[in-house]
Structures are given as structure tokens and as C-alpha cells.
Amino acid sequence: MFNIRVMRMGQGVEWALHACHLLAALPPGSSLSSGQLAEFFALPAPYLSKHLQALSRAGITASVPGPQGGYRLARSPGEISLLAVVEAIDGSASAFRCTEIRQRGPASLPQSSYRHPCAIASAMARAEAAWRRELEAVTVADIMATVGRRAPAAASVARTWLARAVGANPELGETGGPADSALPPERN
């Protein structure tokens, strides 16, 4: 009857954020196929591919054609906010839609009595604005730094996997560039 949207992000948001995190660690000029990304996260490739295409349409990732093609970030990790990824996957529509039910039923008043916005709608709008501000303030680079501090072993494993996936040798330091800074070395 009513088009009510629950403020809940789809699983594609999680998948897309993790994919961006991994793509941020790629050596310069490298890309990962949707199949490689799906393998890394043990996700169904067709569904992940759909989300990667949405990220490309939003200008967050770039599709690299050819047999060695795949996806890479279209911008630096510091320029990609979590909100941009969320909106690329789930859209930017407001999570709450007031239908003004206060103006219906036996206690409703004449239209002119409703000079102020609905208090519930106002509270929900403030909450959503705060949520959006927080997501806009955090970038993929911020996530990379946090993961490096909180889970250095996972970052090391990811670096090694990436180096193998793109044909570099991590023991010889061939990953270079953003990969080394995006996934910090192990430390306590």
C-alpha cells in the first residue's frame, strides 16, 4: 500500500565497500577482474559484478577492457567517501518518507492548522543528515588506515594475495606505489 523503505543498507553496500578497499591497494596500472574480487571475498561473481558496474556508473571504479582487464579505482582512495559508495549501490533516496498521517483520521484538523513540519519527520531528517555527514566524512583511505592498525596480519595477507593476483612479487617489493601505503605493513 505505502512505499515504505527501511533504513537498512543492502548487502551490496558491504560488498562494494570491501571491493573498493581491496582495489585501493592495487599496484599502479593494475586491475582485478570481478571474478578475482569474488574469489577474494568468497562471493557470487554475478552479483558482485552487478555492484561493480554500479560503482563504475558512479565514477568510483573504472572498467579496464581486455584480457588482463578488470576494475580499478577511478579516483584516489582519499577522494571516495563511504557515502558515495552507499549511494552508488543503494541510491540517494531518503530513508524516511513522511506521508502526513497526522492529517488523517478522526483527530485531523483543517490543513491550515499544520503550519510546522511533522515533528517525527523532522527528527528523522536530522538523524539521516547526521548519518550522511558521518559517511561523507570517512573515505576509503580512512578505512585502509584503520584496517592497517586494527588488523595488520589481514593487511599483509591481502598484500600478498594482490601481488600474486596481478603477477608481482611481494618479496622483491614489486607491488610498490599505492599498494604499500594502502595496506600498511604489519606492526604493533
At which residue positions do the language-model features occur?
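Short helix-capping/hinge SLiMs at alpha-helix to coil transitions
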Residues: 25-29, 75-76
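Short, intrinsically disordered or compositionally biased N-terminal tails of bacterial proteins
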Residues: 1-7, 188
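A short alpha-helical element within helix-turn-helix/winged-helix DNA-binding domains
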Residues: 31-42
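Short amphipathic alpha-helical elements of helix-turn-helix/winged-helix folds
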Residues: 19-26, 88
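Canonical helix-turn-helix DNA-binding module
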Residues: 42-61
